[in-house]
């Protein structure tokens, strides 16, 4: 429809023009209405209706400074108008002037207590201020006044979600959708809440509904990609991101999410490029800045020489980041995203990482201290007062970190001497979470912000904080960079020094540490007795699996190789064909990578080359199984003859589970603790015969297991007889108790 002409050469009929503009505005002809409002203000700059309505148009278009000027002029004429005050508040809020915006909405509500929109908009300001409980009160007042107010129902759901009350949030989102079925944002955030409830597949359905309504909704496309990433459907995640970036090429979060997908596809160069693009688009995107060095580290290496190249690139980028931070060249809050930068895959290079971890750890602690300052710590306990022990973990559920160490701390520490508090940072819950809840004096669960966790832990005044792992769960890594207790300790849940000056001690085991182990840690190394932990063997539901089902030959000696593929370094690929050539009819059983198929395919390609170099075919000897639930995994191990430990990063929980099935284990002890855990277990059992001193000895032992049935049977019998020596070792708990007493009480 053509624009309406203005009268030429005649005085403007202001009342008629305002009426005409209002009618056009009501019809949705915004450009024509805007033109008429402007013509009115050109001759009557004090026309209240034109000021207010043109302000609304500018506000909707995002021209916030102009909108603010128009509303301010209108308020000069009508200072108590609730509608104008509300528009003024929205403009202020959009410009980040949250305090002034809150005052404007308070004034609007004072003039009209039943103004549902003002209550809703007030809640929006409180959300921007991270005052979600107060925001919820405002949204609930809006809904009480106007029950069919879909936007307020939606906002109520958002606030509930931010408060961790996701069950209620889901109902609020569903109410908003029932009121307005075409409400795309409500469908999209319905998906966010479902995802938070662990219903990720259902969340994707909600994102798809949102996109069916509004096909280019950026948040829905981004969150859909994140959900697909979580479900390990990486190709579909890329499709969603391609769609997002086609319509919004400057979407920094989209580029960053694409980088995360590239990491899983083992494409580190592409991942780094995506991160760099995200930072170029948003210099305050601190998570992307932290993770750029991290993304240089692949999941799996193609050749040994790649390790040195990637390691050097990681160090170079980390030093550059430190230089930029120290020089003040980076805008934004660098505490945001720190936990996502944990260099998990650095530990899988087979080298001592103390210096690199210290480089990272010192930077992390410095950034956190600048943001949060010092915390008042607990005074030493009085005589007879229990020592307060806090355990910070994202793994208070059935997980190797829980099973090795953490569970025993929760259940076995002497309650007369120690008061145990659990800080469950993670999201997953199961029966083991309930075990933790029942045994802890106090058990606090997330999700919560870093600031909230800091305040909660600081208020509890722990004398000791124990971290079962640092480097696996992002928020744990952030909390560990703060000094919240006089004594703070890490542990072998992630067998790597933290590098954090805030972590005083690393708890390990005397049988798994080399003589020079102290040099591998930035922390003081504490060698607990034996393997360093009290292990309770799990009760596993029985399952039956045959060799035929698994593609294994009845005649073959079958080697169980159940470790994550990224534990297998390329320099040791030749071990498998060496064993095969000497052992004869044998097969190696590997577990496929749980993520992108590209990782498994790369490892298979490496093995094919190694076997071909030995004049053998990998397909004759190597079998790859998909991931399995525990009972089937255990049953699969039972049809094997020998567990072959991975070299330079030995098994922990997998070794314990193999020994529980009476499986002989062949291992080789290497320079670092993480390559010696299985060896420590076997020595604790009195089985040093299958602990090799070199890779050549390892190959010879594996071959002997195939060729000497009597030897293998004898080892199997001894495993069955002596495996109980590994279980329920209270010596490690008693030593931990004594260590804590000395560290806290100074005796």
Predicted features, each with a name:
Residues 1-553, 605, 609-617, 624, ...:
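Alpha-helical solenoid repeat scaffolds of the TPR/TPR-like class and their adjacent stem/linker regions
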Residues 659-660, 683:
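Short alpha-helix at the nucleotide-sugar/activated-sugar donor binding site of glycosyltransferases
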Residues 664-673:
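Short hydrophobic beta-strand element within catalytic cores of glycosyltransferases
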Residues 408-416, 570-585:
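Short hydrophobic signal-anchor/transmembrane segments that target glycosyltransferases
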Residues 654-655, 678:
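Short glycine/serine-rich donor-binding loops of glycosyltransferases
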Residues 469, 645-651, 669:
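Short Ser/Thr-rich beta->loop micro-motif in glycosyltransferases that lines
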Residues 423-428, 588-605:
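Glycosyltransferase donor-sugar binding loop
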Residues 644, 658:
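Donor-sugar nucleotide-binding helix/loop cap in glycosyltransferases
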């Amino acid at each position: 429809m053509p624009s309406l002409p203005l009268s030429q050469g005649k005085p403007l009929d202001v009342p008629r023009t305002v009426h005409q503009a209002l009618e056009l505005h009501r019809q949705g002809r915004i450009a024509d209405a805007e033109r008429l409002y402007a013509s009115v203000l050109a001759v009557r700059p004090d026309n209240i209706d034109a000021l207010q309505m043109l302000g609304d148009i500018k506000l909707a278009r995002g021209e916030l400074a102009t909108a603010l000027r128009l509303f301010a002029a209108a308020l000069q004429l009508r200072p108590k108008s609730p509608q104008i005050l509300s528009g003024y508040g929205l403009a202020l809020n959009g410009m980040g002037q949250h305090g002034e915006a809150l005052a404007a909405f308070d004034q609007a509500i004072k003039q009209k207590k039943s103004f549902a929109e003002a209550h809703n908009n007030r809640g929006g300001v409180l959300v921007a201020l991270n005052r979600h409980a107060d925001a919820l009160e405002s949204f609930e007042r809006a809904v009480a006044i106007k029950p069919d107010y879909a936007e307020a129902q939606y906002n109520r759901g958002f606030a509930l979600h931010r408060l961790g009350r996701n069950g209620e949030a889901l109902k609020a989102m569903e109410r908003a959708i029932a009121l307005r079925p075409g409400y795309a944002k409500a469908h999209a955030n319905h998906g966010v809440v479902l995802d938070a409830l662990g219903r990720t597949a259902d969340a994707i359905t909600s994102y798809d509904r949102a996109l069916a309504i509004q096909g280019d909704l950026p948040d829905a496309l981004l969150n859909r990609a994140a959900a697909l990433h979580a479900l390990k459907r990486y190709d579909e995640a890329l499709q969603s991101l391609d769609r997002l970036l086609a319509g919004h090429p400057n979407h920094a979060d989209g580029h960053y999410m694409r980088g995360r997908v590239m990491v899983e596809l083992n494409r580190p160069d592409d991942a780094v490029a995506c991160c760099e693009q995200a930072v170029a688009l948003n210099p305050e995107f601190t998570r992307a800045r932290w993770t750029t060095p991290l993304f240089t580290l692949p999941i799996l290496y193609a050749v040994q020489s790649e390790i040195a190249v990637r390691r050097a690139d990681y160090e170079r980028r980390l030093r550059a980041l430190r230089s930029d931070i120290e020089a003040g060249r980076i805008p934004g809050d660098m505490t945001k995203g720190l936990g996502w930068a944990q260099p998990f895959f650095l530990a899988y290079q087979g080298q001592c990482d103390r210096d690199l971890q210290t480089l990272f750890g010192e930077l992390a602690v410095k950034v956190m201290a600048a943001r949060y300052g010092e915390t008042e710590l607990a005074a030493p306990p009085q005589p007879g007062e229990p020592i307060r022990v806090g355990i910070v973990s994202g793994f208070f559920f059935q997980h190797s970190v829980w099973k090795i160490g953490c569970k025993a701390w929760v259940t076995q520490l002497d309650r007369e001497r120690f008061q145990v508090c659990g800080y469950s940072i993670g999201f997953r819950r199961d029966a083991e979470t309930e075990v933790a809840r029942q045994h802890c004096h106090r058990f606090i669960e997330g999700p919560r912000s870093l600031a909230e966790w800091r305040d909660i832990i600081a208020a509890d005044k722990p004398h000791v904080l124990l971290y079962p792992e640092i480097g696996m769960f992002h928020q744990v890594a952030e909390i560990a960079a703060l000094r919240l207790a006089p004594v703070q300790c890490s542990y072998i849940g992630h067998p790597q020094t933290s590098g954090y000056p805030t972590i005083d001690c690393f708890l390990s085991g005397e049988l798994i540490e080399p003589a020079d182990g102290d040099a591998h840690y930035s922390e003081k190394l504490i060698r607990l007795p034996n393997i360093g932990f009290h292990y309770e063997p799990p009760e596993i539901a029985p399952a039956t699996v045959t060799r035929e089902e698994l593609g294994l030959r009845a005649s073959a000696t079958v080697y169980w190789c159940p470790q994550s593929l990224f534990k297998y370094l390329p320099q040791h690929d030749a071990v498998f064909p060496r064993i095969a050539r000497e052992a004869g009819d044998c097969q190696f059983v590997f577990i496929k990578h749980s993520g992108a198929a590209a990782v498994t395919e790369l490892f298979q390609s490496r093995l094919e080359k190694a076997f071909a170099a030995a004049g053998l075919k990998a397909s004759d000897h190597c079998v790859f199984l998909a991931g399995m639930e525990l009972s089937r995994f255990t049953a699969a191990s039972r049809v094997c003859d020998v567990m072959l430990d991975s070299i330079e990063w030995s098994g922990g929980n997998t070794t314990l589970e193999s020994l529980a099935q009476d499986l002989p284990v062949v291992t080789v002890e290497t320079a670092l603790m993480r390559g010696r855990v299985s060896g420590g277990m076997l020595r604790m059992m009195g089985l040093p015969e299958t602990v090799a001193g070199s890779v050549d000895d390892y190959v010879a032992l594996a071959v002997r297991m195939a060729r000497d049935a009597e030897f293998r049977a004898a080892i199997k019998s001894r495993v069955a007889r002596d495996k109980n020596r590994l279980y329920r070792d209270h010596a490690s708990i008693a030593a931990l108790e004594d260590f804590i007493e000395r560290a806290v009480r100074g005796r």
